[in-house]
C-alpha cells in the first residue's frame, strides 16, 4: 500500500488539518472511555512538536446533519485532550470559513457531522475543508470505509494529503494478520446479529483454522445445530447460512451457557449445558466449560483476530466468557489484533491493552478490511501519492 506518510512531510509552520476518530462514549459531559483519544495523541503531539498549526476534526455520534446539537458537541473531548496534554485546547464552533491557530498550537473543530453534506462527500464542503490547510492528514482508520467530506473529499482537494502514523500502523498490522498470517489462526466474532457480520464470517471462514462465535451470533449457530435457545436473540432466517459456514470451517459451539430470564443489570445468572436451555431462558454468555475450551484454542493460536464480546460483559455476571477469552489472548504468544467498539471496552475493562499486539481503533472499517473491501479514504490517499 503506497501512501505518503505524515512523518515524511515537513510540517513546520504549516496549517495541518488532521482527521481523527474521536467518536468516544460521553456521559453527563464526560468522556467515559478514552482509548480512541489516547490512540490519536501521538499523531497530534508529533505535529505540534514539528511546529505545525494543528487543527483536529472528528465526528461524534449521529446528530441530524446540518444542525448543532449540544449532546453531540466535541466539547467534552476537547476538555479531555486538554487534560491529557496539559494545555488549552479551544473548540472552534464555526470553522469552515477559517480557523485562527498559531504554530505549535492545537485547536479542535466542532463535530464534522454538524455540516450539511458531510455524509454525502459534498464537493463544495470538501473544498472548504481543504482550503483550511496546507497538509491534510487522514489518521482515522475507524472512518476510512466511509467516503465522506472529512475523510475522502478533503483528501482529494488538499494541497498535500497523507496518512497519519495511526492509520499507517493500522494498515500494516491488518496486512500482517490477513496477508501472511502465522498458523494456527483463530478469529472471535461476537455481536448481536449474524446479518451485520455475515460477510465477515464468510471471509474469515476461508482464512482461519478456528472461528469462535459469540453473543447473539452464537445463538443463531446453536439453533442451526439443533440446540434450544429459548427466548434468546437469534435470527431464524439465517440458519441456512450458519449451517453452510459450519460445514466448511471449524466453528466450535459452547457446550455450556449462562442464562437468565430477564435482560437486566440485576438478572440472576444460571449456568446450563447448551442442551438444557429452557423455553424462558435467554443466553447471555458462554459457560465456564466453553470459556476454558475456547481459551485453550486461543492460547495455541499464532494469529488471533478479535471482534466483539461473547457475552453481555457490561453486566459482570455475564462477563465471565469475555474475560476468559481476553485473558487467553493476553497470554497468547501469537500476534493478536482486537478491533471494534465493544471489543475496545472489553480490552479496557479487563486491562489487557499492553498484552494485545495491536488494538485497532476501527469498527466498521476494521470489519470491511477483514472482508477484503477497498477503503475509500485509503484509496484516495493512494491516488494522491501517485500524482
Curated annotation (Swiss-Prot):
Binding of substrate, residues: 21-23, 36, 59-62, 113, 146
E.C. designation(s): 2.7.2.3
Lineage top rank: taxon: Bacteria
MF term (GO), any: ATP binding
Compartment(s) where it occurs, according to its Swiss-Prot or TrEMBL record: Cytoplasm
Pathway: Carbohydrate degradation; glycolysis; pyruvate from D-glyceraldehyde 3-phosphate: step 2/5
UniProt xrefs under InterPro entries: Phosphoglycerate_kinase, Phosphoglycerate_kinase_CS, Phosphoglycerate_kinase_N, Phosphoglycerate_kinase_sf
Entry keyword Ligase: no
Enzymatic class: transferase
Main localization (coarse): cytoplasm
Catalytic activity: (2R)-3-phosphoglycerate + ATP = (2R)-3-phospho-glyceroyl phosphate + ADP
Pfam family of the protein (one): PGK
Record keywords: ATP-binding, Cytoplasm, Glycolysis, Kinase, Nucleotide-binding, Transferase
Transmembrane domains' residue ranges: none
Gene Ontology, cellular component aspect: cytosol
Binding site for ATP: 197, 314, 340-343
Biological process according to GO: gluconeogenesis; glycolytic process
HAMAP family assigned: Phosphoglyc_kinase
Subunit structure: Monomer.
Family: Belongs to the phosphoglycerate kinase family.
Name of the protein in question: Phosphoglycerate kinase
